[in-house]
């Protein structure tokens, strides 16, 4: 949510900032803005409501010249999406700040600042920071010290980039509870919410830690200070994925590209993590075996799509590893009186590693007596990775589309590796382990086969063009896949969709079924198939139109109002992964037919970094 870009260079920074904002569009936003310090130390600002293209048009009409600047895409929290509320915010004509996060004590600070003569022109909590920084700068006459003093007064989450005309060759940044990275160039330095924003200018990054304050200045090395004010040497990391991840490579949308990348993503998630007959516990870290050997129960905490991955893992852990599992929505978990039995492992799932509620849950869990914490994450160097005892990187590469696709399947692969690792230490049948390992090796090929059905799925999607509601059904470990299918459809097509265990039809949802309510189901050939088929007959008897994705061996005939698409057979343990793909493609094509913004659906953000 929101995006920050900052640049200190020996060249004009407007283009750098603008390209950075374009690359952050996937995060979700409603306005954009930029402030640049000219060489004669004038602070010039431009803001626009809507897409980055609106800001670009304004800049085309009147460019901002200068070698130091900050820019921002805003996701409205305090105050409506207006130019007045867009970032950067200024205090007078000297100081500008951009901010991601939420300041919880902004009303108290605002009253204090107003009593001191500061005048507010917006509805945002960020303007409080601008005036607070100006007050501290007036006292200290040093921007770094002003930021240090100001952040001690802030309650809540923030990532900041600040510039001042009295020190026109530098930017000061700070972070707490919201991500911020430093881009290290040759004779120039940058700040951003996400490395993707800076890939055109550098592939070397410093991931700031919680409480860090950073000073980037022309002709000087980057200086990072911890929360205690001590100068720290932070490691510089080289970005591994290359700049191609931020391009569509000929696909119409990032989402479609990312769906079609899943064979390679699954292969990458498995690379080096399997022996001939088992998963390698060492993949989770050098301390993994010592921690896993103590595990008698697992708590999984996540949000959104990652939560659905956790729900699938609950079935796996109980069925194959013989370990009870509990799955929690992060925003609910941290406000409950949680009972933690002895020997419980705490597992977090997050694509970005910066999801605010998941991070807060991890910090809450530290004091609850878990045997250890494991982060399954896609972003190395993220807060979740740094703060967990063990990590498993999903190796999905950058995911630009707001609706998660390849990150979800790679999380499922990681969770199966966790299941096999815990199962081996808990007496799981060795031959069954070997069967699943072999099935994992063939999974990328099976996914490729499913992607070959794209045209047939696109044809099915035409039935959804005029629909306003849909119902998804699944049983067992495929109920979470139905939940994920419903989430995808509502996220990007804006069709209201719900998911239920198929056995719950008679307990309410059946009342909704008629010819205008398409019902989508997944039908793998497992022990629940016959019960599922009975549930589907109940739908047909009420005039519902069925769309069934079934194993190629399932005896289920097409008929009027019954559409069956057959998928290749896969080991039933991995069927939830395979059956995810047709639901992703169905949602994608329905959204295209509806004419929605597939990659950036309304009101949603890719990385939810505020609570």
Predicted regions and their residues:
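Conserved short alpha-helical segments that host acidic/polar catalytic motifs at enzyme active sites
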Residues: 1-248, 252-253, 261-296, 335, ...
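Hydrophobic alpha-helical scaffolding
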Residues: 7-10, 99, 119, 136-140, ...
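Glycine-rich oxoanion-binding loops at beta->alpha junctions
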Residues: 67-84, 275-290, 313-349, 355, ...
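Glycine-rich, anion-gripping cofactor-binding loops and their flanking helix/strand elements
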Residues: 181-206, 305, 331-366, 504-538, ...
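Generic C-terminus detector
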Residues: 255, 560, 566, 570-611
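Active-site phosphate/pyrophosphate-binding segments
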Residues: 262-266, 270-299, 380, 390-518, ...
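Glycine-rich phosphate-binding loops that contact phosphosugars or nucleotide phosphates
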Residues: 293-442, 524-527, 531-565, 586
């Amino acid at each position: 949510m929101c995006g920050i870009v900052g640049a200190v260079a020996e060249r004009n920074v407007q283009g750098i900032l603008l390209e950075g904002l374009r690359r952050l569009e996937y995060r979700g936003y409603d306005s954009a803005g930029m402030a640049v310090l000219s060489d004669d130390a004038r602070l010039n600002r431009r803001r626009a409501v809507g897409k980055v293209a609106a800001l670009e048009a304004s800049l085309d009409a009147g460019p901002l010249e200068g070698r130091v600047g900050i820019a921002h895409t805003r996701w409205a929290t305090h105050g409506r999406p207006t130019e007045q509320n867009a970032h950067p915010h200024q205090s007078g004509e000297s100081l500008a700040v951009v901010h991601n996060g939420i300041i919880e004590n902004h009303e108290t600070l605002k009253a204090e600042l107003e009593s001191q003569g500061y005048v507010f022109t917006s509805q945002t909590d960020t303007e409080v920071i601008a005036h607070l920084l100006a007050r501290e700068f007036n006292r200290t006459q040093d921007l770094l010290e002003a930021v240090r003093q100001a952040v001690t007064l802030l309650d809540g989450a923030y990532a900041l980039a600040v510039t001042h005309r009295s020190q026109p060759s530098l930017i000061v940044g700070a972070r707490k509870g919201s991500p911020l990275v430093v881009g290290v160039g040759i004779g120039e330095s940058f700040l951003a919410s996400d490395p993707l924003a800076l890939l055109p200018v550098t592939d070397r990054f410093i991931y700031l830690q919680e409480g860090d304050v950073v000073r980037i200045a022309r002709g000087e090395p980057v200086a990072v200070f911890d929360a205690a004010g001590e100068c720290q040497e932070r490691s510089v990391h080289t970005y591994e994925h290359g700049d191609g991840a931020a391009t569509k490579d000929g696909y119409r949308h990032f989402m479609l590209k990312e769906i079609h990348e899943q064979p390679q993503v699954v292969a990458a998630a498995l690379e080096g993590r399997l022996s001939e007959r088992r998963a390698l516990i060492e993949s989770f870290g050098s301390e993994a075996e010592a921690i896993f050997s103590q595990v008698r129960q697992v708590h999984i905490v996540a949000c959104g799509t990652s939560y659905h991955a956790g729900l699938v893992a609950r079935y796996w852990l109980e069925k194959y590893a013989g370990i009870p599992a509990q799955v929690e929505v992060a925003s609910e978990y941290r406000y409950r009186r949680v009972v933690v039995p002895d020997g419980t492992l705490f597992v977090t799932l997050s694509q970005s590693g910066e999801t605010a509620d998941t991070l807060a849950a991890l910090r809450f869990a530290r004091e609850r007596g878990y045997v250890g914490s494991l982060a399954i994450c896609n972003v190395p160097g993220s807060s979740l990775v740094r703060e967990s005892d063990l990590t498993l990187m999903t190796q999905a590469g950058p995911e630009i589309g707001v609706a998660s696709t390849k990150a979800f399947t790679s999380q499922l692969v990681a969770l199966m590796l966790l299941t096999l690792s815990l199962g081996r230490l808990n007496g799981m049948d060795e031959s069954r382990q070997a069967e699943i390992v072999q099935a994992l090796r063939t999974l990328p090929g099976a996914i490729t086969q499913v992607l070959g059905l794209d045209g047939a799925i696109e044809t099915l999607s035409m039935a959804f063009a005029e629909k306003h509601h849909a119902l998804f059904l699944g049983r067992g470990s495929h109920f979470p896949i139905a939940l994920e299918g419903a989430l995808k459809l509502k996220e990007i097509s804006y069709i209201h969709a719900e998911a239920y265990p198929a056995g719950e039809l008679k307990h309410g949802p059946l009342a909704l079924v008629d010819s205008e309510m398409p019902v989508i189901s997944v039908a793998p050939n497992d022990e629940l198939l016959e019960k599922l088929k009975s549930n589907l007959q109940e739908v047909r008897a009420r005039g519902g139109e069925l769309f069934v994705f079934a194993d190629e061996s399932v005896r289920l005939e097409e008929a009027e109002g019954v559409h069956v698409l057959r998928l290749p057979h896969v080991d039933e343990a991995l069927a939830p992964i395979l059956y995810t793909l047709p639901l992703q493609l169905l949602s994608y094509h329905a959204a295209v037919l509806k004419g929605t913004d597939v990659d950036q659906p309304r009101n949603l953000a890719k990385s939810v970094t505020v609570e």
